[in-house]
């Protein structure tokens, strides 16, 4: 009698373990999404750092940065700052035509981040006391993507 319960328990445990284990395709997909996010952030950074575009007004806007950025769930903090980022870029766009595709980039970043972090929005960002410029903001998220990608490649 106990053997049957033990076998059923083991079978259910195996099913749970199998269904919750990440597959190589989901890992590969996550890797591709991280690389796409990194590419989009670098493109935005390149546009902002353009020598012709050093608009002092754009650099005065401050962005909130989380104290710790180490896991995919921290991408929620990036999502929360995308609208202010888009507003600053739209302001600069009126003066510089190089920024005409910033809406597409922000949209791509938003979609990619939502796919990476999932639909859970209960994570609360713990922001740093000191705000960052647009350049610092983009650089921090670029470094985050690079570190996550390198960790995944090491595993």
From Swiss-Prot:
InterPro entries linked: 4_helix_cytokine-like_core, IL-2, IL-2_CS
GO CC aspect terms: extracellular space
Domain of life: Eukaryota
Compartments (UniProt record): Secreted
Record's keyword terms, sorted: Adaptive immunity, Cytokine, Disulfide bond, Glycoprotein, Growth factor, Immunity, Secreted, Signal
Glycan-linked positions: 23
SUPFAM superfamilies: 4-helical cytokines
Disulfide-bonded cysteines: 77-125
GO molecular function: cytokine activity; growth factor activity; interleukin-2 receptor binding
RNA-binding listed as a keyword: no
Signal peptide positions on this chain: 1-20
Gene Ontology biological process terms in this record: adaptive immune response
Pfam families (UniProt xref): IL2
Similarity field: Belongs to the IL-2 family.
Function: Cytokine produced by activated CD4-positive helper T-cells and to a lesser extend activated CD8-positive T-cells and natural killer (NK) cells that plays pivotal roles in the immune response and tolerance. Binds to a receptor complex composed of either the high-affinity trimeric IL-2R (IL2RA/CD25, IL2RB/CD122 and IL2RG/CD132) or the low-affinity dimeric IL-2R (IL2RB and IL2RG). Interaction with the receptor leads to oligomerization and conformation changes in the IL-2R subunits resulting in downstream signaling starting with phosphorylation of JAK1 and JAK3.
Protein name as catalogued: Interleukin-2
The gene coding this protein: IL2
